[in-house]
């Protein structure tokens, strides 16, 4: 005759352990879903587009203080045919040089605005149109492209941290002999 051995397990501690495990799992923060991330990105992209439109208005008004207000404290500006402007004073000199050109008319439009999934960085690229007077009072026209990198600041506001632009036109050649 064969002996059958039945072992009993106390279920109280096992059930308590499982309950604690499930309770701890339920306390984990839920990962943001794709729809929430996309909604936040779209809102931030709209904010950057509006800030950029306001920046264009400051440029059209030749408002140096208004223009400078869009830059973060640690911004860098990479203007064409000039050294890098990597502090507030250098940026202001560069902007003042641009906005005080005789006969200046300047505007730009974003082609694309994108914000990172983390929501702290964004970029914008687009095109610009500019007219000014040459040294003889004749109009000079230029078109080109722009690139701006924006960063959300600790206070939640967006500021430009990198700004650059350059012409689509070929470099003029000298006709002097």
State the predicted function of each range.
Residues 42-47, 64-118, 127, 132, ...:
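A solvent-exposed, acidic/Ser-Thr-rich amphipathic alpha-helical stretch
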Residues 1-9:
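N-terminal secretory signal peptides that target proteins for export/translocation
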Residues 12-24:
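Bacterial N-terminal signal peptides
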Residues 28-33, 143-171:
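Short beta-strand edge/turn micro-motifs at domain boundaries
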Residues 27-69, 73, 172-177:
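Short, low-complexity N-terminal intrinsically disordered segments enriched in polar/charged residues
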Residues 115-122, 151-157:
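A short, structured loop/turn motif at beta-sheet edges
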